[in-house]
Amino acid sequence: MAPGCKSELRNVTNSHSNQPSNEDDAIKVFVRIRPAEEGARSADGEQSLCLSVLSQTALRLHSNPDPKTFVFDYVAGMDTTQESVFSTVAKSIVESCMSGYNGTIFAYGQTGSGKTFTMMGPSDSDNFSHNLRGVIPRSFEYLFSLIDREKEKAGAGKSFLCKCSFIEVYNEQIYDLLDSASVGLYLREHIKKGVFVVGAVEQVVASAAEAYQVLSRGWRNRRVASTSMNRESSRSHAVFTITIESMEKSSEAVNIRTSLLNLVDLAGSERQKDTHAEGMRLKEAGNINRSLSCLGQVITALVDVGNGKQRHVCYRDSKLTFLLRDSLGGNAKTAIIANVHPGSRCFGETLSTLNFAQRAKLIKNKAVVNEDTQGNVSQLQAEVKRLREQLSQFTSGQLTPGSSLARDKEKANYMEYFLEAMLFFKKSEQEKKSLVEKITQLEDLTLKKEKFIQSNKMIVKFREDQIMRLERLQKEARGSFLPEEQDRLLSELRDEIRTLREQVEHHPRLAKYAMENHSLREENRKLKLLAPVKRAHELDAQAIARLEQAFSEVSSTETNDKGLQGLPPKAIKEPSFFTSTEKLKVQLLQIQTELNNSKQEYEEFKELTRKKQLELESELQSLQKANLNLENLLEATKVCKRQEVSQLNKIHAETLKIITTPTKAYQLCSRLVPKSSPEVGSFGFLRSQSAPDNDILNEPVPPEMSEQALEAISEELRTVQEQLSVLQVKLDEEEHKNLKLQQNVDRLEHHSTQMQELFSSERSDWSKQQQDYLTQLSDLEKQLQDAQTKNDFLKCEVHDLRIVLNSADKELSLVKLEYSTFKESQEKELSQLSERHVQVQLQLDNARLENEKLLESQACLQDSYDNLQEVMKFEVDQLSKNLQNCKQENETLKSDLHNLVELFEAEKERNNKLSLQFEEDKENSSKEILKALETVRQEKQEEMARCEKQMAKVQELEESLLAAENVVSCLEKSRESDKELVTNLMNQIQELRTSAGEKSEAIDTLKQELQDISCKYTAAVADKEESKELIRRQEVDILELKETLRLRILSEDIERDMLCEDLAHATEQLNMLTEASKKHSGLLQSAQEELTKKEALIQELQHKLNQEKEEVEQKKSEYNLKMKQLEHVMGSAPEYPQSPKTPPHFQTHLAKLLETQEQEIEDGRASKMSLQHLVTKLNEDREVKNAEILRMKDQLCEMENLRLESQQLRERTWLLQTQLDDMKRQGESSSQSRPDSQQLKNEYEEEIIRERLAKNKLIEEMLKMKTDLEEVQSALDSKEKFCHRMSEEVERTRTLESRAFQEKEQLRSKLEEMYEERERTCQEMEMLRKQLEFLAEENGKLIGHQNLHQKIQYVVRLKKENIRLAEETEKLRAENVFLKERKKE
């Protein structure tokens, strides 16, 4: 792109994008339209634009048949400024980089669309100081201004390190622009750093100027070539990367933030028919287009992925896309400047650029803060907690508006749950605060009371000494008191014991112990609210009441036995009190330990009972299922037995019928009928003839056959019954096995569900406890951190104030020294100047005499000069009047000339019209046209003659003006000669005066030089010391960095090991669970297979049973038939007495058969009853087991209660034993101390007086300490108020500083825009001047190229215009200098 074209570009103004967006980290897209250059006209003179800006966020592409409208984050027109582009696009990205985010800015567009101008600025000037400098230099300035601001705010607690690298992608090869000898570099990927270039030079910079030097050094190595569309076309993609590392130290933790700012200038897409590229240029264009097409494919794939499609993003197809992977859909905040050309000849490339920008706008990145915190574990944990709290606050207050309805519902539910949780959290926090306040109050109370106890201990020691002394005296003077005196002494001692007991009862430590006991009782009460514990406690209370009653009776009997012995004084003195307190302490500790043990045992017992309950529930479930199965089986057996009984009844009836019916016996007729007598032969013959058939049918069955038949039937029945019993046994066994398997399966399923529920409940409890502990820890750590930060801040302020005071003291001492040296030098100089003054006074007297002579001659010359001045004024007035007249005439002539030019133009147009008319109507009006032309020519000649006359007049006036100017110049020369004489004389005098001043100034300059040299020497020494200190600090920093790096590596190794252990543990648990699940599945599968086998076997047995039943049915049917026949025979027997009867053994056999059948029926009923009895027995056993379980639970509770009760009784007996021992000791001491009671009384009174005095002294000391404490408290309050005031002052200064910084940035941007506006106005003036020259030349060509007077007039006008423009340029230059000085200030 030509530099002249680039300088005409204007940038986008800001409006809305300084603030970070709320809609994730979507890529920001800004469209910039470059202005159309002067050479944009086509061959036939047309100039058309294919774009128009509708608003700050929309533009329209004029396409046929329908125009297209595009919406972006910002649309810049042709007349926007570079400062506006920077404030809109780059400011927010640079601020994000300061906060720890990665940022990328790159320009995209066709060749010649202004990408390099947008990123760098004009190429034919110093970009870093030029008013039209681009985004990259302005980003440097703003970045380092933010760094300086952060350093000023944080001081030595925050440091920054900036490193620059500059690479280019040329023909799909990567080259380092900072190393001209570099060959193709390679891209590598790191898990934390992301994609980086191996071997790229990174140069450390400390200011914007150094960064720009690095940029310009690399820019000179970039590949640039000329094409038909752009004189300086970029042939490679350039990526300038700034790595910003900030290290902030807060107490013991070190926060390190690392961010990357990528500033990318892409090469433009090209068309060979437009650029006419050949050879190497064509190859370069192909590689550029290929990489840009890969970039477009990546953006399309990212858009599809964002819409929910499964797409592979081809980052590795091009070096450019792989290098910018984090900027496109990764960890970065990205801004794209799409540069387009408004010309209609670039319509295709403009449309493709806008489509690319519209697709890129849909991509959303995932930018995160690249921060690493180093320090000790507590600080890191506190930082993690703080960040978690910030995250929870951020998530609680943020709602994305553009989500779907389902997500809105889920978020609404989540917000409700979160609000409830926050309410509970606030309540818990309030309760915790109240408890903490209560604890602090109690701790203060305990501290005060402990002090009081310490004072009482001192008193007690004194009393013990006095008691020992009294005991010695008592031993020496035993038996000297009367009984009345002894009684009185004993009463006084009892009163003292009573007061001491009251003191013991109201002792603060006892109150503390009472409070602790109260809290423990509350916990115990909560534990006692459980139902089994309540029952046990009721029993315990009854037993305790009985035991206490017995103990009170025993103690009363013991006290009665001991008599009316008085209490000795030694027993009630302070040692016993302290022993009792120590015992109470021991008892309290024992109670606490026992309570903890009981709690632990209760938890263990609870866990055991819970496990047993789970097992019993599983057994109960399995037994219930087994019970159901047994009930079903019982019902089935009942039905089966009922059917069998009915079938047996039917068989019995049929057998009876078969037995009673006769059978045919043709062969047995002769054998069974006996020989008849002759008397009855005829009668028998008649009977036999009358019914032969009936005789055969009514022939009785022989007993042998009936017995055989019955035996066959009974054998068949027996075999069938045996088979049936065998099958029934097998079926029962299989059902029993099936029942057991089913019970096992149910038990396992129930156990697995219970274990899962238990696991989930324990996990939830553990997570809740962990969360509670974490919240408590985070709150405490936050409070501690806040206190530490306040303390550090105050310390830093005190340190700064001390430094300021020290520096002020040093400056004051230096000023005093300088003042003393200056005073001495002034005195010396005054002495020297006094000597010189005398010498100069003499020289002045001589010069005064000479001056008087010169004044006389000057007076003469002045008179002549005044005369000449008056003459010159008169002549100048005359000439000025003539000049004004000439100017007026010149103006009139100009207006006449303008009118003539207009007439000439009109005549010219009319002439053209007439020529056209002449061509059209050549034959009709040729003579009239010729006459008109002649008249026009005559008028033209007259006008030309008139113009020549006027030009001659103007020339004469100019000659007269020149002559007058010559006269004036001569007069001025004579005046200047006179002035020169006067000035020479005055100069001589002035030289004499200045010689003395110069010498004094020389002395001053020498002194000043000496002071400058000394200052330079001291500055050089200070610089040397500073450099040494800086080197030392850098070495220390390097050592610290090495140490932090080592610690970081160690921490990472430890974390890796922990993660590996966690992974191994998780894999082991997973393997165990998978094995257990496999075992369970195998067991279930085997059980299912066995069930299927059993079912198949049951079906086979059922089939056989059905076959057997069918056979039995057939046999029964046969048996029934026989029984019917038998019954028929039995019925017909009385009618025929002469026929043979059924044998008696047949009836007995039938009775036996019936008995067996009845016995079988009874057996079935008995089996049914036995089954019912078995079921009832199982139910009874289950109830018995449940009762036994409850009884065992009750026994456990009772055992626990008895244990507690026995422990309490043991403690009470121990207490009573100790009290009994004390009472015995007291009795012994009282028996010894009775004789010396009076003396003891006196000594006690003296001791009491001394104790009162000591008590008063202690009270006074305590009051003094209270007053001192109040004074210290007031001083502390004043200090706190002062600290609060100072913190408010610091906060106010911070707000003022931020406001001043913002105002400064706004003024700077406005100033930059003014500079750009001025440059633009200068360019527009230059363009207007060129147009004016062009029009003047055209005017001269049209009018005055044949007239010398007109040429002279034209030259004069040009001179005047040139003078005016020179004056304007001088004004603008002065204004520019003024603005630059103001900017420097």
From Swiss-Prot:
Alphabetical UniProt keywords = Acetylation, ATP-binding, Coiled coil, Cytoplasm, Cytoskeleton, Microtubule, Motor protein, Nucleotide-binding, Phosphoprotein
Modified residues annotated as Phosphoserine in this record? S1139, S1167
Its annotated compartments are:
Cytoplasm; Cytoplasm, Cytoskeleton, Spindle
Checking CDD domains in the record gives:
KISc_KLP2_like
Q: Where is this region: Disordered?
A: 1-24, 1222-1243
* SUPFAM superfamilies reported in the protein's UniProt record: P-loop containing nucleoside triphosphate hydrolases
Any coiled-coil ranges, and where?
368-1385
- Give the Gene3D superfamilies listed for this entry: Kinesin motor domain
Instruction: Kindly list the biological process annotations in GO that this record carries.
Output: centrosome separation; microtubule-based movement; mitotic spindle assembly
State which residue ranges cross the membrane.
none
Looking up Pfam families in the UniProt record yields: HMMR_C, Kinesin
Q: In which tissues is it expressed?
A: Expressed in sympathetic neurons.
Q: What does this protein do?
A: Plus-end directed kinesin-like motor enzyme involved in mitotic spindle assembly.
Q: How does it assemble?
A: Interacts with MKI67 and TPX2.
Name-wise, this protein is: Kinesin-like protein KIF15
The source organism is Rattus norvegicus (Rat)
